[in-house]
């Protein structure tokens, strides 16, 4: 059984036992989180919410808080002017513990 959850303005397809890196959530390592479920499916059938499904829960456990690899943004003009900026996006790694339909 799988589910499509929404968190941090993005959607993720998850199943029980998956580890997912999502946008940073407030919480400590070992804490529990619940997600909005948009779709649940398995064995050739799917239920779609309008916009979310009532009675369906996806629970996860926070495994780690970290930062992604650095992304470098570099701009250069013809006159010799340059600008270099870096950014590391924070993330939360979550272990999906249960998907209940």
Swiss-Prot record:
Q: Which InterPro entries match?
A: bL21-like, bL21-like_sf, Ribosomal_bL21
Ranges in coiled-coil conformation = none
What is any Pfam family matched here?
Answer: Ribosomal_L21p
Cite the GO molecular-function annotations of the record. Answer: rRNA binding; structural constituent of ribosome
How this chain assembles, per its entry, is: Part of the 50S ribosomal subunit. Contacts protein L20.
HAMAP family on file: Ribosomal_bL21
- Protein name (record): Large ribosomal subunit protein bL21
- Which organism is this protein's natural source? Anaeromyxobacter dehalogenans (strain 2CP-C)
Q: What is the lineage of its organism?
A: Bacteria, Pseudomonadati, Myxococcota, Myxococcia, Myxococcales
Which gene specifies this protein's sequence? rplU
């Amino acid at each position: 059984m799988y589910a499509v959850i929404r968190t941090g303005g993005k959607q993720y397809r998850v199943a029980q036992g998956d580890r997912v890196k999502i946008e940073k959530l407030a919480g400590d390592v070992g804490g529990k989180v619940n997600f909005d479920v948009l779709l649940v499916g398995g064995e050739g059938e799917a239920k779609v919410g309008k916009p979310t499904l009532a009675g369906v829960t996806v629970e996860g456990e926070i495994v780690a808080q970290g930062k992604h690899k650095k992304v470098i943004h570099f701009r250069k003009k013809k006159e010799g002017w340059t600008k270099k900026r870096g950014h590391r996006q924070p993330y939360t790694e979550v272990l999906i513990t249960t998907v209940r339909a």
